[in-house]
Amino acid sequence: MMVSRLLKNYSLYFAWLTALIATLGSLYLSLVRHIPVCDLCWYQRVCIYPLTILLGIAAYRTDRGVVKYALPLVVLGFLFSVYQYLQQMIPGFAPINLCGSTSPHCSEIHWEIFGFITLPFLGMLATLIMSFFLIMAFYSLDKRLAN
């Protein structure tokens, strides 16, 4: 009961924290560790980076209405992550030619642990976590309006 109340009351903060960690992590890996960024990675970043600002402001203002704007970005980022992960993990997966000649190929694995955790996998995980917290925020909004 206490965990449920904690999740409902602070779900926007947890979603914002997840977006912040994902943003800072991707910036660290590209700017400090110099891991090359492919086009699909950029598309994922376009979906995640604005969430850091949107969710931060919404959490500060306790504006749960942001869910209807943030969730589509999260879902789109998830789809880009899944597509890139499939390109990396399934040999012969026919990629759509989104990658330009100057950027690294999207199917290249530049960082991997345990044989299956790659950067797109972490992107999928972050978007799933954000989706969970945003859905919790949405349902707590419905209950508050009903009371």
From Swiss-Prot:
Name the Gene Ontology molecular function terms of this record: protein-disulfide reductase activity
Q: What is this protein called?
A: Probable disulfide formation protein
Keyword Membrane among UniProt keywords: yes
Chief localization: membrane
In which compartments does the protein localize? Cell inner membrane
Ranges that cross the membrane? 9-28, 43-62, 69-86, 115-139
Entry's SUPFAM superfamilies? DsbB-like
Supply the Pfam families for this chain: DsbB (PF02600)
Q: What are the leading ranks of the lineage?
A: Bacteria, Pseudomonadati, Pseudomonadota, Gammaproteobacteria, Legionellales
Disulfide bridge map? C38-C41, C99-C106
| Alphabetized InterPro entries for the sequence | DiS_bond_form_DsbB/BdbC, Disulphide_bond_form_BdbC, DsbB-like_sf
- Membership in a protein family: Belongs to the DsbB family. BdbC subfamily.
Q: Name one GO cellular component term.
A: plasma membrane
From the UniProt record, give one GO term of the biological process aspect: protein folding
Q: What does this protein do?
A: Required for disulfide bond formation in some proteins.
Q: Give the bilayer topology.
A: Multi-pass membrane protein
Cited Gene3D superfamilies: DsbB-like
Query: What keyword terms does UniProt attach to this protein?
Result: Cell inner membrane, Cell membrane, Chaperone, Disulfide bond, Electron transport, Membrane, Oxidoreductase, Redox-active center, Transmembrane, Transmembrane helix, Transport
